[in-house]
Amino acid sequence: MQLNMLKGKLHQARVTQTELEYEGSCAIDLDLLEAVGIHEYEQIHVYNIENGERFVTYAIIGERGSRMISMNGAAAHKCNEGDRVIICAYAGVPESELGEFQPRLAYLDADNRITQRRGSIPLQVA
């Protein structure tokens, strides 16, 4: 059996621009894409921390080193510049490989610089 598992996550990325008329859905700095293993045209899920919007789109390459997170086309209606978002990609992982599977997680500051990388999410305690 294959399970859909979190593959890569950009946590608390800041939307740097919105382009309603631009072709493509979410342009992300290539350095950030590579950090979490998200590929060009790969399906991504975007969770807007500011307004609760959750939507599915796809990633396109943004200029390397720009720290760009640009919501384009219809996705531009879901976010404003400066909004904090979580961007996730998922992958099918065979149940037999779950023991060695780890997601690639990157935590960002307000300027979309990576401040921390992890392979797991800490245990939440009561």
UniProtKB/Swiss-Prot annotation:
UniProt subcellular location: Cytoplasm
Binding partners and assembly: Heterooctamer of four alpha and four beta subunits.
Protein role: Catalyzes the pyruvoyl-dependent decarboxylation of aspartate to produce beta-alanine.
One MF term in the entry's GO annotations: aspartate 1-decarboxylase activity
Enzyme Commission number(s) from the entry: 4.1.1.11
Cross-referenced InterPro entries: Asp_de-COase-like_dom_sf, Asp_decarbox
PANTHER family, A to Z: ASPARTATE 1-DECARBOXYLASE (PTHR21012:SF0)
Major subcellular location class: cytoplasm
Key words, A-Z: Autocatalytic cleavage, Cytoplasm, Decarboxylase, Lyase, Pantothenate biosynthesis, Pyruvate, Schiff base, Zymogen
Cofactor: how bound: Binds 1 pyruvoyl group covalently per subunit.
Residue positions where Pyruvic acid (Ser) is found in the record: S25
Protein name, as recorded: Aspartate 1-decarboxylase
Alphabetical list of CDD domains matching this protein: Asp_decarbox
Cofactor dependency: pyruvate
Residue numbers binding substrate: T57, G73, A74, A75
Source species, domain of life: Bacteria
Pathway in which this enzyme or protein is active: Cofactor biosynthesis; (R)-pantothenate biosynthesis; beta-alanine from L-aspartate: step 1/1
Family matches, as Pfam families: Asp_decarbox
Family: Belongs to the PanD family.
GO CC terms: cytosol
GO BP of this protein: alanine biosynthetic process; pantothenate biosynthetic process
Post-translational modification: Is synthesized initially as an inactive proenzyme, which is activated by self-cleavage at a specific serine bond to produce a beta-subunit with a hydroxyl group at its C-terminus and an alpha-subunit with a pyruvoyl group at its N-terminus.
Keyword flag Coiled coil: no
